[in-house]
Amino acid sequence: TATVDCSDYPKPACLLEYMPLCGSDNKTYDNKCSFCNAVVDSNGTLSLSHFGKC
């Protein structure tokens, strides 16, 4: 199972790097930072489906 360490999030701003991740909500996130911020916002209900686009 793919995992991402989001322990040092949320961050106020994300870099514009493009390394897509697919969330359990079937949404493609541009990078780890935007994904982890969404994980924090979801109170831990969002998880990583896989690396790459959904």
UniProtKB/Swiss-Prot annotation:
It is found in: Secreted. One of its GO terms (molecular function) is serine-type endopeptidase inhibitor activity. The keyword Repeat applies. Gene3D superfamilies: 3.30.60.30. Disulfide bonds join 6-36, 14-33, 22-54. Glycans are attached at residue 43. Coiled coil: none annotated. Avian ovomucoid consists of three homologous, tandem Kazal family inhibitory domains. This is Ovomucoid. It comes from Opisthocomus hoazin (Hoatzin).
